[in-house]
Amino acid sequence: MDSEPSWTATPSPGGTLFVPNTTTPWLGRDEELAKVEIGILATVLVLATGGNLAVLLILGLQGHKRSRMHLFVLHLALTDLGVALFQVLPQLLWDITYRFQGSDLLCRAVKYLQVLSMFASTYMLLAMTLDRYLAVCHPLRSLQQPSQSTYPLIAAPWLLAAILSLPQVFIFSLREVIQGSGVLDCWADFYFSWGPRAYITWTTMAIFVLPVVVLTACYGLICHEIYKNLKVKTQAGREERRGWPKSSSSAAAAATRGLPSRVSSISTISRAKIRTVKMTFVIVLAYIACWAPFFSVQMWSVWDENAPNEDSTNVAFTISMLLGNLSSCCNPWIYMGFNSHLLPRSLSHRACCRGSKPRVHRQLSNSSLASRRTTLLTHTCGPSTLRLSLNLSLHAKPKPAGSLKDLEQVDGEATMETSIS
């Protein structure tokens, strides 16, 4: 007697995972809805590719001046570009041809790369958030080992994505949609009927639910730390307005009284650091908004026997499967929105140091150290003028050059403020 046939599932309209195939696969599809899918995927492909290439170009022109935050954004752009090229593009071609056109090896490779890009993009965002958590809540640890703590956080998402995507290679294969029909497609194959439900639930937990829980916890702690920081600075300001005869160092010491040891030496959070926290927070919100419909529909498709399937004409169901890819479109534009000053600076980088004489400005600004403000001399070159910005301190001892370098690495953009006048 032959063994029980394996349970099969077909790719979803999103193409990354699958939904159960409960209809006769030879009936074709809704061509009008397919045109809408193709239009959406083509738009996502253009926006995601163009936006992430622009970010890579901007950061590439920064050269060795990239901060640790820029390194995370660089790799996030690479993962999002991977989503565009290895997930959206194959699915676009697949929707155009309807059936998968390629060998069994190509089928497995496409499915592997599609999920790898999802894992890498999600975990890179998670690593970037963890870096902001360490920079805000544990600044001393970041100061002691600035580079050692950065590269493992960047390498871990790529390694985890490569490992966790391996099941796709064994689940998907090129096979006949109906035995003896001669029509081939890249389908998932499970021996047990509960296989799709278990696999979809696992991927939803690994790519969406657990990362969102960690992201929420990190930002809860970050917001709590910023709130304590603002409370301390407000109290210090009130004491100064009362006319207490205190020097800057003693005022800072009073301000840090009662704070935990990890922030007692660095009692204020710089504006640049807060800006990077805001940027990462907006990227996280965009990620949740884009991927929540996708994974909700995936879970619905395997846990509800009456859910629509891949050949359904339910427009809302089909479009929801495509929304997750919008996250890779939003990320580069969010980054450029928070760092709009980098675009003209990068484009004018090669025309630097020409024209008139530099003009020097003395500028007093709040540093990331309340009691250890450091003098920074930075410059940026524009088409016509060169501006030098000085952050001066009148009540602090000079810091060693090595310490200053560490501070700049931890703070993302540190306390440098450059502009083109």
From Swiss-Prot:
InterPro entries: GPCR_Rhodpsn, GPCR_Rhodpsn_7TM, V1R_C, Vasoprsn_rcpt, Vprs_rcpt_V1B. It is found in: Cell membrane. Keywords: Cell membrane, Disulfide bond, G-protein coupled receptor, Glycoprotein, Membrane, Receptor, Transducer, Transmembrane, Transmembrane helix. CDD domains: 7tmA_V1bR. One of its GO terms (cellular component) is Golgi apparatus. One of its GO terms (biological process) is phospholipase C-activating G protein-coupled receptor signaling pathway. One of its GO terms (molecular function) is vasopressin receptor activity. Signal peptide: none annotated. The keyword Cell membrane applies. It is a multi-pass membrane protein. Residues 1-35, 94-108, 174-202, 301-318 are extracellular. The keyword Transmembrane helix applies. Glycans are attached at residue 21. Residues 399-421 are annotated as: Disordered. Residues 60-71, 131-151, 224-280, 339-421 are cytoplasmic. The chain crosses the membrane at residues 36-59, 72-93, 109-130, 152-173, 203-223, 281-300, 319-338. Pfam families: 7tm_1, V1R_C. Disulfide bonds join 107-186. SMART domains: DUF1856. PANTHER family: NEUROPEPTIDE RECEPTOR-RELATED G-PROTEIN COUPLED RECEPTOR (PTHR24241), VASOPRESSIN V1B RECEPTOR (PTHR24241:SF18). Receptor for arginine vasopressin. The activity of this receptor is mediated by G proteins which activate a phosphatidyl-inositol-calcium second messenger system. Belongs to the G-protein coupled receptor 1 family. Vasopressin/oxytocin receptor subfamily. This is Vasopressin V1b receptor. It comes from Mus musculus. The gene is Avpr1b.
